[in-house]
Amino acid sequence: MATQTVENSSRSGPRRTAVGDLLKPLNSEYGKVAPGWGTTPLMGIAMALFAVFLSIILEIYNSSLLLDQISMN
């Protein structure tokens, strides 16, 4: 038989630790979703600004955007 059941094993379930007790409140809202869009527009704005930042860095790196104060050797 491929499977075996172990009865009266020494393992008695998960242990309680100090770190687990500290992190427990963070997991208490698991599965609950607030109705509506929430902070989605704010995240969209942050992503757009980050994309603009990355494109500026890429243009500086490719020397398509020349700045007088920055010398690229």
Swiss-Prot record:
<comment type="function">
    <text>One of the components of the core complex of photosystem II (PSII), required for its stability and/or assembly. PSII is a light-driven water:plastoquinone oxidoreductase that uses light energy to abstract electrons from H(2)O, generating O(2) and a proton gradient subsequently used for ATP formation. It consists of a core antenna complex that captures photons, and an electron transfer chain that converts photonic excitation into a charge separation.</text>
</comment>
<dbReference type="GO" id="GO:0009535">
    <property type="term" value="C:chloroplast thylakoid membrane"/>
</dbReference>
<dbReference type="GO" id="GO:0050821">
    <property type="term" value="P:protein stabilization"/>
</dbReference>
<comment type="subunit">
    <text>PSII is composed of 1 copy each of membrane proteins PsbA, PsbB, PsbC, PsbD, PsbE, PsbF, PsbH, PsbI, PsbJ, PsbK, PsbL, PsbM, PsbT, PsbX, PsbY, PsbZ, Psb30/Ycf12, at least 3 peripheral proteins of the oxygen-evolving complex and a large number of cofactors. It forms dimeric complexes.</text>
</comment>
<feature type="modified residue" description="Phosphothreonine">
    <location>
        <position position="5"/>
    </location>
</feature>
<dbReference type="InterPro" id="IPR001056">
    <property type="entry name" value="PSII_PsbH"/>
</dbReference>
<feature type="region of interest" description="Disordered">
    <location>
        <begin position="1"/>
        <end position="20"/>
    </location>
</feature>
<protein>
    <recommendedName>
        <fullName>Photosystem II reaction center protein H</fullName>
    </recommendedName>
</protein>
<dbReference type="Pfam" id="PF00737">
    <property type="entry name" value="PsbH"/>
</dbReference>
<dbReference type="GO" id="GO:0015979">
    <property type="term" value="P:photosynthesis"/>
</dbReference>
<feature type="modified residue" description="Phosphothreonine">
    <location>
        <position position="3"/>
    </location>
</feature>
<dbReference type="GO" id="GO:0009523">
    <property type="term" value="C:photosystem II"/>
</dbReference>
<feature type="compositionally biased region" description="Polar residues">
    <location>
        <begin position="1"/>
        <end position="12"/>
    </location>
</feature>
<dbReference type="GO" id="GO:0042301">
    <property type="term" value="F:phosphate ion binding"/>
</dbReference>
<comment type="similarity">
    <text>Belongs to the PsbH family.</text>
</comment>
<dbReference type="InterPro" id="IPR036863">
    <property type="entry name" value="PSII_PsbH_sf"/>
</dbReference>
<feature type="transmembrane region" description="Helical">
    <location>
        <begin position="41"/>
        <end position="61"/>
    </location>
</feature>
<keyword id="KW-0150">Chloroplast</keyword>
<keyword id="KW-0793">Thylakoid</keyword>
<keyword id="KW-0472">Membrane</keyword>
<keyword id="KW-0602">Photosynthesis</keyword>
<keyword id="KW-0934">Plastid</keyword>
<keyword id="KW-1133">Transmembrane helix</keyword>
<keyword id="KW-0604">Photosystem II</keyword>
<keyword id="KW-0597">Phosphoprotein</keyword>
<keyword id="KW-0812">Transmembrane</keyword>
